[in-house]
A protein has these predicted regions:
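Non-catalytic, C-terminal membrane-associated alpha-helical segments of glycosyltransferases
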Residues: 240-289
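A short, conserved alpha-helix in the catalytic core of glycosyltransferases
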Residues: 167-169, 173-226
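Glycine-rich, basic loop-to-helix element that forms the pyrophosphate-binding segment
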Residues: 62-82
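A conserved acidic beta->alpha catalytic loop
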Residues: 22, 36-45, 64
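Short, well-formed alpha-helical segments that are part of the catalytic scaffolds
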Residues: 12-25
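Short, flexible, basic/aromatic active-site loop/helix in glycosyltransferases
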Residues: 138-174
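Conserved donor NDP-sugar-binding/catalytic core segment of glycosyltransferases
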Residues: 97-134
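Short beta-strand-to-loop acidic/aromatic patch adjacent to the donor-nucleotide binding site
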Residues: 85-97
Length: 289
């Protein structure tokens, strides 16, 4: 049993190299596809020189930086247009590490149950034994409202977080998995499931997981296995200011509600107003730092 890795790089060649150099030694990895998202920092040249002679690595470059969904879709299209043996396709951030035994376990979960469309391991904070939120319920309107208000943000997590008692299950059926590591059945991708490249960054997980569930595949978290996540290194390198990341999040949420959710313009107006007010407060706080 093997898998194919798709790793999206943007202005972060060293983090990508750190991950790929480890994956090269895993017998369970058939091919590693690195998609450079038109990095302006010479990443593509660095990666090309570094992996030029390695047949296990395919290096692609997108014609533009279209964001997470756009870049990963190029990698998915490459997989579907080539005759690879693997039935498991892993969409991975470069700022993660997964041990080979954990990766093998995830591949086995998919291979053992073809009704599972996508699976992810538990997500740990790198260098610690602390787990991050590894899965959540599909965000509802109230969650998106309350999470837009700083005072209510932690309380709002109650709308989407699963009870800790559920995590004793080795295979836990969930709504949404984080986009930092998604192991997807190739047959799901062959049925036309891809990321919505109208979204530059954020909300991509809730959209693709919902698409997979709508095809009556299961979205599951495997609690027996884990991976380390280095606290969004890649995103923070590209968007160092919190206000820049918040602007992207707000833009994606607004687009999500316009395209996928309520057509109630009053509800949407109230949500968008909360998001814009929170963004204004963030900018105001930044002026006094």
């Amino acid at each position: 049993m093997q898998c194919i890795f798709i790793i999206l790089n943007y202005n972060d060649s060293q983090t990508t190299i750190n991950l790929v150099d480890k994956l090269l030694h895993y017998s369970s990895v058939e091919k590693i596809i690195i998609l450079d998202n038109k990095s302006p920092d010479n990443s593509f040249k660095v990666l090309k020189n570094y992996y030029n002679t390695m047949v296990k690595v395919v290096l692609l470059q997108s014609p533009k930086n279209g964001g997470y969904s756009y870049g990963n879709n190029i990698g998915i299209n490459y997989v579907l247009n080539h005759n690879f043996n693997s039935e498991c396709v892993v969409i991975s951030n470069p700022d993660i590490f997964i041990a080979e035994q954990d990766l093998n376990g995830i591949i086995h979960v998919l291979d053992a149950d073809k009704t599972i469309g996508v699976v992810a391991p538990m997500m740990k904070i790198a260098g610690a034994d602390t787990f991050k939120i590894s899965a959540w319920r599909h965000p509802c309107y109230l969650y998106d409202c309350f999470s837009s208000v700083p005072f209510f943000r932690r309380w709002a997590d109650k709308f989407i977080c699963y009870d800790k008692s559920l995590f004793i299950q080795p295979i836990m059926r969930v709504d949404v998995l984080p986009g930092s590591f998604l192991a997807i059945q190739k047959q799901v991708l062959q049925r036309g499931i891809k990321f919505d490249d109208r979204f530059f960054l954020f909300c991509e997980e809730r959209i693709i997981c919902e698409k997979i569930r709508n095809l009556e595949y299961k979205v599951v978290l495997s609690t027996l296995f884990s991976y380390d996540h280095y606290e969004s290194i890649s995103i923070k390198k590209s968007y160092s200011r919190a206000t820049a990341r918040q602007r992207l999040l707000n833009d994606s949420k607004k687009k999500y509600y316009k395209l996928y959710r309520s057509k109630n313009h009053i509800r949407n107006f109230l949500l968008f107003l909360l998001m814009d007010f929170n963004f204004f407060l963030m900018q105001l706080r930044g002026l006094f730092k």
